[in-house]
Amino acid sequence: MTEAVIVDAVRTPIGRSHKDKGVYRDVRSDDLAAIVVKALVERTGVDPERIEDVVLGNTQQQGEQGFNVARNVALLAGLPATAAGATVNRLCGSSLQALAQAAHSVVAGGEDVQIVGGLEHMLHIPMDQDLDINPKLFQQTSKAALHMGYTAEFLAQTQGISREDQDLFALRSHQKATAAFAAGEFRGEIVPVWGRDETGRRVLVEVDQCVRPDCSLEGLAALKPAFMPPGLGTVTAGNSSPLNDGAAALLMMGRETADELGLKPIAKIRATAVCGVDPAVMGTGPVPATKKALKRAGLTLADIGLIELNEAFAAQALACIRMLQIDESKVNVRGGAIAIGHPLGASGARISCTLLHAMQDRDVQFGLATMCIGIGQGIAVVFERI
């Protein structure tokens, strides 16, 4: 059976979604994606004529992200017209879904050489813009279950996750990301992008904007709950992921094709899985998705050397870690979304990118990327380093 392999993975620095301070406030998301696609082609030396499809995840497909943005990105990046494009939406799991279904295509003998990834600009296209939920949906679940912050609070209460637990987890995320930048560990994955600093000056952005080297427990403890009244709520802006802009991309193909083209893969897709959970506990989606993916891979959690578990909220990440009984030292070793950022449709590709480079640097054989997804889903992908 043909194996789906990853040749390289890159991403932009992740920007803060802020109208006055965001480094990408004047940069379009399709331009961000075109930059990483172009960089991927240049870094790998793959013949653009061999690229059959560009599959990108995105959650808000309107405005600059509308009209099949993946196809637009392919053309903006200078790929030939023969490179097709498809935009995929599984909310937060969109770009991990793009990666998974591209792998399925390779294994099934369909499209072979593909660029997969994702993009999101949460400043230009807010996540709730023009949202129109069918009222009949609330016959199946509560309105609160569709509000991610309330689901995080629900998990904190039902799983016994304290405010202190969440703040400490958030602090560690910033500390790990800060240490990784200081050690140059992101150099292999980040493609610098021109943007603007807070004064409006044009700058070359080389680091994730929301990582805070000065983060402290005292500062986190001073923040008020974001979704529930003080004294009741524990989820704050400090122990949740911020709003972000960014893009990421990976080059995928069959192993035989990589050999033919003289390209050295860094990993292969060992297994993928998705699942549904009750929307009220959407944050637990990684638990059954991980179990399903590991079963398909013929592995156990003990076999997994590194895990990228998307940090939508500290409460959600901690709930999954405890339910799966994961060794926390394996999780998000270079920081997670609380520090790095969570640009929705780009996040699955971002965590995969970070995971694959960390696996290479640390000589780890198996890695897991997994995410919770709004309205109650989970997605997981198991990678094996080559």
Label each residue range with its predicted role.
Residues 1-28, 217-284, 288, 295, ...:
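Condensing-enzyme catalytic core mediating Claisen C-C bond formation in acyl metabolism
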Residues 10, 16-19, 103-159, 213:
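Glycine-rich loop/linker segments at domain edges
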Residues 10-13, 26-35, 43, 165-260, ...:
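N-terminal extracellular/periplasmic Venus flytrap/periplasmic-binding protein-like
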Residues 23-113, 118-135, 190-206, 280-281, ...:
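Conserved beta-ketoacyl condensing-enzyme motif
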Residues 27, 58-111, 143-150, 214-242, ...:
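Conserved catalytic cysteine-centered active-site region
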Residues 29-45, 69-70, 98, 148-155, ...:
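Short, well-ordered amphipathic alpha-helical segments that serve as non-catalytic structural scaffolds
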Residues 88-119, 156-185, 249-256, 321, ...:
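Active-site-proximal alpha-helical scaffold in enzymes
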